[in-house]
């Protein structure tokens, strides 16, 4: 622990030694779970920075510590920067939120079913345009935005929320077209300089690499991450796109959090009108009933508190920005690893700073009827047992007891080297008897008959396998068959996807990803040789068979 800057009082209250110890304990627990090599956090109120803490290492090999000057990539928190710049142009009368994007980018084109209204700036800001998330298949924005013309849409603009990085890339091109300068210059002039964020860099380039903490990823990119997984330096890349290409420090980011706490007012006057900030923080309901997405801001209700902010992820970095307007407190967490949850940690620090005593981590409850013994129905594996324990659910296999981490409802990670290529997915049969899937292998409850599975067609058997690309954002995925139902499985799901999703055939030979008929993400396969597809196109970007 390196404590570089500390002020013990704020707003008439005191962060005592117990409060600081609680914050350090919360960080230590988060780092033990996710194992980022280094982390920094900042706490602020509307008037100034209250606390900066740094932990761990900016670079493991040399054991270089994180300092208050260390830069971290903040990922999609950059979307909040982009939204502020767009709304400034709205305040200036230079952008109409409800005008079609083509009004500002004449070459912008997205196939729309007949009768659908055009996509507007507001749709892009709120992730309701109905377009794909984007696979980041190129290092720049223009070609990815251009390529939207080759991808179908299945829902009308404004109809549903679907997170889209490429939508914010398009907003960056709109900013450049209207403001007449590169994105980095727009952000520096409109946000960084007025907020006195002089250490922040609005583009990730080789020129700043020496100031950046080294990003770390898991050594095995085709396995689910867990606390014992080895780390390796993440792929380095340059980027300057409006969905996330900013590097900053905890001190500088506290200045940006204050902009949120002050409703759009900076240290020397308003950056956003009250009306613009109200629009920014008025959310569109998303996939989580306790959360809503505004214009570059996520509003989330957690345990009786209303938080606003955004998370961010880059190749080798994670970030979390949370503000509690009612408590007049905000926190930024930056880390150079992709484990743990910086958004959750930021909320915990706010609670501690506001006088709450941190509670114990909730123990994942296992639904009663999921516990029991299971046998593989393909005669290719050993039986296993799922059981509840005081520390949460466990898997017992081959004389070992393995802790299960909940990824989603009825979806668990077994943190060892035997089961970490796929999650454990509990599914229910028609008579409500659970069965357990691990990739394409089914485990049946002991004493229960194995239900017959439909035989997959030759066409489906051809697509099953492991696919890769050299794209550092989404390096690989697998297709497995569960009877005649194909499933798409990621070790680390990209934006717009889940860890596991079923695939549904479409009339044109492609597959829709997931059960939502309005989901724009599609997958299709070609180049079948010796009964194996050699190439898969994931929402427009190629991946190649690797098994």
What do the predicted segments below correspond to?
Residues 14-74, 94-96, 103, 109-111, ...:
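Short, conserved catalytic-motif segment at the N-terminal edge
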Residues 24, 28, 32, 87, ...:
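Solvent-exposed, non-membrane alpha-helical residues enriched in polar/charged side chains
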Residues 24-27, 41, 47, 70-98, ...:
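Active-site SXXK
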Residues 48-60, 112-321, 325:
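Short, surface-exposed loop or secondary-structure junction motifs
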């Amino acid at each position: 622990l390196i404590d570089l800057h500390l002020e013990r009082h704020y707003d008439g209250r005191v962060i005592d030694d117990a409060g600081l110890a609680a914050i350090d304990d919360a960080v230590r627990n988060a780092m033990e779970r996710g194992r980022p090599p280094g982390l920094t956090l900042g706490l602020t109120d509307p008037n100034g920075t209250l606390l900066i803490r740094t932990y761990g290492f900016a670079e493991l090999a040399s054991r270089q510590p994180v300092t208050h000057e260390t830069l971290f990539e903040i990922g999609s928190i950059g979307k909040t920067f982009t939204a502020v710049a767009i709304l400034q142009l709205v305040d200036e009368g230079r952008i109409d939120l409800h005008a079609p994007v083509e009004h500002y980018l004449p070459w912008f084109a997205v196939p729309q079913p007949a009768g659908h209204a055009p996509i507007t700036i507001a749709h892009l800001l709120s992730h309701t345009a109905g377009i794909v998330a984007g696979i980041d298949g190129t290092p720049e924005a223009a070609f990815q935005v251009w390529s939207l013309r080759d991808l179908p849409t299945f829902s009308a603009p404004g109809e549903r929320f679907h997170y889209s990085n490429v939508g914010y890339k398009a907003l960056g091109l709109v900013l450049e077209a209207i403001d007449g300068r590169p994105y980095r210059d727009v952000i520096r002039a409109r946000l960084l300089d007025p907020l006195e964020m002089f250490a922040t860099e609005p583009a990730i380039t080789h020129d700043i690499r020496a100031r950046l903490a080294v990003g770390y990823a898991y050594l095995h990119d085709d396995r689910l991450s867990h606390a014992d997984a080895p780390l390796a330096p993440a792929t380095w890349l340059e980027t300057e796109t409006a969905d996330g290409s900013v590097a900053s420090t905890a001190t500088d980011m506290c200045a940006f959090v204050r902009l949120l706490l002050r409703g759009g007012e900076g240290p020397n006057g308003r950056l956003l009108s009250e009306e613009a900030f109200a629009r920014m923080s008025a959310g569109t309901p998303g996939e989580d009933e306790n959360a809503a997405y505004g214009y570059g801001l996520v509003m989330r209700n957690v345990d009786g508190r209303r938080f606003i902010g955004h998370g961010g992820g880059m190749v080798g970095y994670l970030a979390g920005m949370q503000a509690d307007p009612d408590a007049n407190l905000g926190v930024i967490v930056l880390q150079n690893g992709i484990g743990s949850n910086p958004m959750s940690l930021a909320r915990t620090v706010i609670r501690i700073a506001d006088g709450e005593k941190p509670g114990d981590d909730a123990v994942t409850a296992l639904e009663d009827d999921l516990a029991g013994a299971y046998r593989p129905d393909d005669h290719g594996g050993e039986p296993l047992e799922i059981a509840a324990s005081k520390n949460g659910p466990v898997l017992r296999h081959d004389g070992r007891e393995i802790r299960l981490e909940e990824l989603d409802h009825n979806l668990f990670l077994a943190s060892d080297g035997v089961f970490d290529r796929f999650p454990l997915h509990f599914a229910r049969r028609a008579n409500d008897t659970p069965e357990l899937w691990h990739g394409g292998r089914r485990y049946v409850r002991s004493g229960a008959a194995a239900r017959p599975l439909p035989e997959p067609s030759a066409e489906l058997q051809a697509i099953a396998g492991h696919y890769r690309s050299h794209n550092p954002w989404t390096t690989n995925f697998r297709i497995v068959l569960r009877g005649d139902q194909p499933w798409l499985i990621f070790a680390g799901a990209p934006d717009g996807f889940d860890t596991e999703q079923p695939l549904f055939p479409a009339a044109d030979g492609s597959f829709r990803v997931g059960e939502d008929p309005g989901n724009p993400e599609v997958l299709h396969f070609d180049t079948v040789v010796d009964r194996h597809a050699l190439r898969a196109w994931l929402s427009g970007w190629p991946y190649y068979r690797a098994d």
